[in-house]
């Protein structure tokens, strides 16, 4: 079987339907990159695209990097803080509500296995731990600085997250935490 299209902007694809409503499509849909698209019956999303060089992208695969704007903060022992901006946001992450220490929590869009990375930069510390909190409980993803320390700490791990999980940062001890995208941030990428 061959599917041919007359011009680059045309479509040459296989369309899978239920009751004449399209729910999946694979082929050359409006461009020359091969793609697999899915629909809820109203809106199409590209699940996978492969260009002429053989490179693939997954434009709706959840991935994000979140940070909080400002200069610095000194969260109280036991306080939770959040984020104000996304440096990268793909796949439906949202900032949700507000945390006790300012900023918003992050709403996870899809269940799955994620690579998570936490970076925390401090100007000073009296001994502190900053951990990613999932639904209010501190997780194993954390960084710790001894008393008298300053600088950048980072840690990463693979985490199982569920759609609807709410993520924030949980602080123990005392530290002056530097803010901004290059200072303190959380990154997640669904594997």
Where are these regions (language model features)?
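Short, surface-exposed charged micro-motifs
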Residues: 25-27, 47-49, 105, 158
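Noncatalytic modules at the cell exterior or secretory-pathway interfaces
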Residues: 159-173
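Conserved aromatic beta-strand anchor motif in extracellular beta-sandwich/beta-rich domains
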Residues: 131-136
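Short sequence segments immediately N-terminal to proteolytic processing junctions that release a mature
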Residues: 36-37, 46-62, 166
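Solvent-exposed serine/threonine-rich low-complexity stretches and specific carbohydrate-binding patches
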Residues: 140-148
């Amino acid at each position: 079987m061959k599917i041919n299209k007359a011009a680059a902007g045309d479509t040459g694809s296989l369309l899978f339907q239920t009751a004449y409503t399209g729910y999946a499509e694979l082929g050359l849909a409006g461009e020359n990159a091969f793609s697999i698209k899915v629909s809820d019956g109203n809106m199409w999303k590209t699940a996978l695209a492969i260009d002429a060089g053989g490179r693939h992208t997954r434009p709706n695969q959840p991935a994000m990097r979140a940070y909080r704007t400002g200069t610095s903060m000194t969260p109280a022992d036991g306080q939770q803080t959040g984020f104000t901006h996304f440096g990268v946001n793909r796949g439906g992450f949202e900032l949700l509500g507000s945390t006790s220490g300012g900023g918003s929590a992050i709403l996870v869009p899809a269940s799955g296995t994620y690579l998570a990375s936490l970076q925390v930069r401090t100007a000073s510390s009296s001994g502190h731990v900053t951990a990613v909190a999932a639904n209010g409980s501190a997780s194993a993803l954390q960084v710790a600085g001894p008393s008298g320390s300053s600088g950048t700490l980072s840690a990463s791990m693979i985490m199982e997250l569920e759609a609807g999980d709410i993520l924030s940062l949980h602080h123990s001890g005392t530290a002056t935490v530097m803010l901004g995208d290059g200072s303190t941030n959380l990154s997640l990428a669904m594997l």
